[in-house]
Amino acid sequence: MKRCAPAVLRNYNYKKGIWSTGVPDHIRKLLRDKSTSPLCSQDERNLVSYFMARGSVPLKSVGSGLTKKATTSITSNSATTTFERQYLIKYLYRHQAYGNVIKIAQKFLYTTIGSQRLLKQDASLPELKKFLLSLLILQRGIQLDQAISDIIQRFLLTQKTMVIDLINSIFSRMVIMNMHEEAVYKWVKWMKLVNGHCEFTNYMENKIVLRNFLSFMRQSNVRPDYLSYLKAIQLTQGPAIASQFATTLLFLLTYIRKFSSAEAVWNYKCEHNLPIVSSDLTCILKTYCHMQKFNLVSSTYWKYPDAQHDQNQFDYLLVAHSRLHNWDALQQQFNALFGIGKLPSIQHYGILMYTMARIGELDSVNKLYTQLLRRGMIPTYAVLQSLLYAHYKVGDFAACFSHFELFKKYDITPSTATHTIMLKVYRGLNDLDGAFRILKRLSEDPSVEITEGHFALLIQMCCKTTNHLIAQELFNLMTEHYNIQHTGKSISALMDVYIESNRPTEAIALFEKHSKNLSWRDGLISVYNKAIKAYIGLRNANKCEELFDKITTSKLAVNSEFYKMMIKFLVTLNEDCETALSIIDQLIKHSVIKVDATHFEIIMEAYDKEGYRDGIINLYKTMSQNKVPANSKILYYILKAVAKKSLQNNEEIKETINMVEDIMENAANGTLDVTYNKLHPSVMAWPMRMIVKHDSPQRALELYNRYNELFFKKHDWISNNNKFVMMRSLLVLLAQIEQWKDFETLFAKYMDRIENIENLPSSTTPNIKLRSIFSGLFPYKVSQLIAMNKIDELPLLWKKLREKGFILDNISWNSAVEALFKDPRTLSYGMKIVDDTLIHGYNLIHKFRLLTKLSEDKTQSSDKSWPTLKMKEKEPNKFQPRLYLKSDTYNSIMRQLDTYLDGIDDLKTLEDQVRDFISNYKYFMKDYLLMPRSKINKWEQIEMRHLSYFKELRKSKRVLPVSKF
């Protein structure tokens, strides 16, 4: 049967169908009824009796030998056609005549071939579904089993997907009818008939089979009794089927994170001596790790050697070992084996290497790897995983790729955890496209389980690129295509992307949609934390306090991130650093939650904005006293504080230089207590720029080279130097020593890097974090263009940056304008920028200065009111322009325009030029012409020729139409 049959059937109606000419009018009239109410018994009896008395069109395959003429005669007069059969079954089902649906189906859907009674080949999916549902509704279980058996026998080889769809439809209807135990029993029985077994351990491979059953397991209004189902199946269908179904249950329960039920199913298998397969062992180890029963992981793993065929199992074993032992004790245990004359096995190496990899002991891991190779051992999964993890932990991402290739070299299958590490490597490289390639590879390998953790990592990566569209698409792909249950992990990741993309309201909408359906085990606190972060971004203190109250009243277990949000709320919205410090004091003494660098970082950032250098230094002392590892941002703030303090006290900055060198050296050799041994470039980039300005460019270059030597191998220098923070520092260095040719080359690379990022396949939305990437840097570019006599290139560059949405600070605008006014070729472009933007901010600032001065002047009338001034007092930020002409720039461009106009000898030409400027740049020219331009030759004549214009302009101080000039 062609799959197009159901589609045709869905679209047919009474009028479009081809009815036999012999169908009586009273039957046709009945069939035109479109209602769903039950038929009266007489009408139903007449209708069914009529069709039961007729035959059906013979199948060609039967080979009845009828002539074409005879067949046509039957069709037109006495035989029931396929269309009539389909319409009749649908009609009777709609009118709830289930008994007669069965009667008609048994007569017209079946045919006899030889001694066998088989379903017809043209039986369609909707017909069969209504037939089966009618049997179910009338509780005819034996007939239902027989009908399913007939369908499997007839269509399994040609229409397996349709058969599975029918079984799942009946299963879902049984669930709706609260026949849960019977539904599960039948589903297992029928799936065994279809597949020859009932053991399914990969959702994506068996999505069609498992989709409805998984939906049943997830329903909040259903409480399945899995052990009861297993007992019934074992009793009636035998232990082999019960064991297979238990394996399926165990896999699905861990897939949807119902670990308590998964443990109960595992215990059932063990208590009833059912066979333990590889999937069972993997699932129970995963369950024990999630339930933090680490002491059971090792004993369970070693108890079932015949089931150790999945690399993921060793991941859970390694995690458990690392949680239960400190690495010093493991090292001693490992070394003791040599002492008693027993050489460590490859398993010993794997466990010890992984434990040391977790704490970033790369040298120890490499030494052990070299040692086992010298002993002629072949690396195992655990050994290779440990090597990969150790290099990831220290930020050696380039080495991660080469170590990942070792899995292929030694013919070892990477596990889910291996791919997770590689996704984290791409996250460290900020390479979303590379991460997508990993996901594509995973989706093509049915042996690898794709988890929520994989998607959460990918979604989180969208924070850096602020690509909320891709993040949302990933979330939908996870929940809809892979049918992975979302928890706080993926929801909070998506919320974070919305927040970083400046869409906090969408993050809040996500919180309101999902928070009600999550439990604390599902990471509910993570979702609350992101909601608080979103409200902080909206500066809504009341909503933040509401969420804090909800968390407290519901006694939700909090985490480190919660306290981070509380500190951020106090510092950002309440401007209460004292209370924030008291929370840090509480965390230092907390028995469960550990204080970390991110808690201190928030307060340090606030102190940095205020210029409170001593506060930053005192906070760092507190961290040192309590052995809290610093991160790169903490080191950045402390270095900046020390440097700024030295400059304020007119001291030399040698102390800062020495401090930077010490920090780099100690971080590189592992003696500095930091969260990450490879320091972020910003730690030395800011001091480097400061040294360029206040000490020696040569010293800054030495610092830069030393940083590369300590933290990057020679072949990694190029990739490190391509980072924006490093390129910015080098650009500042080159500008300070006026190496303009090199500056021009590097700036072109800087622009190319931005364009490459914008042209990546994953760059479907603009990255708002790149908008300010030219702030503080653009004035140097202007200086380079002036020095190389290329200022005529500035308008095109300026236009390009503005069109792409880059934000340039006020210093950049002023430096650009001043440069443009100095060159006759670009003066008009500079005037346009001033007229469109900067002059308005300048006038607003000076207007308020004048109003403030007048309001403070005692000689003025005391009852004089200034409404604009009062408005500014109420909303000061609203009347503070972000872009404006600085006074020195204003004076400079006025002089430059004087010089330009003074160079025009012809009075008529001068007059036309002024008129043209008034027409095109009216706001700027209004300010310019408020004072007589005495430095311009022939200006007195201009004043005399346009006396009324200047008189009105200087009196009204408002823009006048050019026609009045």
From Swiss-Prot:
Q: Where in the cell is it found?
A: Mitochondrion inner membrane
What is an annotated GO biological process for this record, any one? mitochondrial cytochrome c oxidase assembly
GO molecular function terms attached to this record: mRNA binding; translation activator activity; tRNA binding
Protein task? Required for initiation of translation of the COX1 coding region. Also involved in the stability of the intron containing transcript of COX1.
Q: Which gene encodes it?
A: PET309
Q: Provide the membrane topology annotation.
A: Single-pass membrane protein
Highest taxon of the source? Eukaryota
Q: What is its main location?
A: mitochondrion
Under the heading PANTHER family, the entry gives: MEMBRANE-ASSOCIATED SALT-INDUCIBLE PROTEIN-LIKE (PTHR47939), PENTATRICOPEPTIDE REPEAT-CONTAINING PROTEIN MITOCHONDRIAL (PTHR47939:SF14)
Any signal peptide, and if so, which residues? none
- What keywords does the record list, in alphabetical order? Membrane, Mitochondrion, Mitochondrion inner membrane, Repeat, Transit peptide, Translation regulation, Transmembrane, Transmembrane helix
Q: Which residues cross the membrane?
A: 237-256
Provide GO CC annotations from the record.
mitochondrial inner membrane; mitochondrial matrix; mitochondrion
UniProt source species: Saccharomyces cerevisiae (strain ATCC 204508 / S288c) (Baker's yeast)
Q: Where are the PPR repeats?
A: 310-344, 345-379, 380-414, 415-450, 451-486, 487-523, 524-558, 559-595, 596-630, 680-714, 723-763, 774-808, 809-844
Additional notes on this entry: Present with 1160 molecules/cell in log phase SD medium.
Q: Which cysteines are joined by disulfide bonds?
A: none
Q: What is this protein called?
A: Mitochondrial COX1 translation regulator PET309
User: InterPro entries in the record, alphabetically?
Assistant: Pentatricopeptide_rpt, PPR-containing_protein, TPR-like_helical_dom_sf
